[in-house]
């Protein structure tokens, strides 16, 4: 179902766990100045979009509509599939820690975060 909520709420219990917005072409942004996040953004090869969303949602809100309004496909040799598994995992943990250190996170969300880490390790075979 569609929903609207405060960005911080989305960060604390959803984006804490993983990037739930895999298709940046499905996102509509307000006119923003990214100069405040630009340097930190450059540190990420895999999770840059995730970091960007968290930075935006710290100050804004999110509306989610599950209707397929565009299409997203993943190619066999996409960055997501070919990037080093350890680097991928480390950036996910780095983003989770970034969020955990800056926001109030409840115990259930923390448990989901650690469960996702276990799942990701198995998925990436590391």
Q: Where are the predicted features?
A:
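Non-catalytic, C-terminal membrane-associated alpha-helical segments of glycosyltransferases
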Residues: 84-94, 110-126
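Residue-identity detector for glutamine
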Residues: 12, 40, 94-96, 125
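Catalytic core of nucleotide-sugar-dependent glycosyltransferases
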Residues: 72-76, 81-107
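Conserved nucleotide-sugar donor-binding catalytic segment
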Residues: 2-86
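Short linear sequence motifs
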Residues: 37, 43-46, 65, 96, ...
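Generic detector of well-ordered alpha-helical segments enriched in charged/polar residues
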Residues: 12-16, 100, 112, 116
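Low-complexity, flexible helical/coil segments
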Residues: 17-22, 63-64, 97-109, 125-126
